[in-house]
Amino acid sequence: MAWQTPKTDWHGSTNSEGVYTGDRFNASDFNRIKNNLTFLRDMAINLYKEFSLVSLGDDRVPGDYFYADEINQLEENLETLNTNTLRMSYGSAPVYNDNGTTMDFKELNRLEGAILDLYDRLTNESEGRRTFTWNFGMKGGL
């Protein structure tokens, strides 16, 4: 699976009548976040000790519902990834409950911003590693 640039410009507002206008979270957004976390895990295990993320199954299709436990698992997978690698501070993730509050644009910006930051940092760490060519006397050395 390939890296997809996270959406970090989520926006929204609610008018005085309680009507929301702004970005909507859909199947492609869920898949992007889920798959980017898996991509980061695959990148991280080349630099850090082996660890695993909880699988969220197949990609979602339009019309699929997202449940509180799945959204919580995205947050937990981010926390697992962060804890096993760079240990950055990305704020505290809320816990979602069935028929309770849902992710808003602020939480989506925090989540996808953290994913992008980890990607940038892990990429820099991977590309910045020193590598040596060892010849062991092949060209008239000692």
Walk through the language-model features, giving the residues of each.
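Extracellular "spike/adhesin" assembly and maturation modules
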Residues: 1-142
